[in-house]
Amino acid sequence: MPKMKSHRGACKRFKKTASGKVKRERMYGSHNLEKKNRKRTRRLHQSTLVDSTQEKQIKRMILA
């Protein structure tokens, strides 16, 4: 059986932490920032963890 290939788009978007959880960046934080207040843009630049309901599928895509 051939080797499994990882999903390259998912590998660019998600990283596995040392404890085994999956980290992601928030959306809506890259442009049109003048319409958003400072508190919101600061929060959008922080990374967060993937929800536990989707963690299994993403780990399978990035082969982690």
Swiss-Prot record:
Region (Disordered): 1-64
Compositionally skewed regions (Basic and acidic residues) per UniProt: 25-35
Pfam family, one: Ribosomal_L35p
UniProt GO MF annotations: structural constituent of ribosome
Classification via PROSITE patterns: RIBOSOMAL_L35
Residue ranges, compositional bias (Basic residues): 1-24, 36-45
Biological process per Gene Ontology, one example term: translation
InterPro entries: Ribosomal_bL35, Ribosomal_bL35-like, Ribosomal_bL35_CS, Ribosomal_bL35_sf
A GO CC term assigned to this protein in UniProt: cytosolic large ribosomal subunit
Keywords, alphabetical: Ribonucleoprotein, Ribosomal protein
Similarity annotation: Belongs to the bacterial ribosomal protein bL35 family.
Protein's UniProt name: Large ribosomal subunit protein bL35
Source species: Prosthecochloris aestuarii (strain DSM 271 / SK 413)
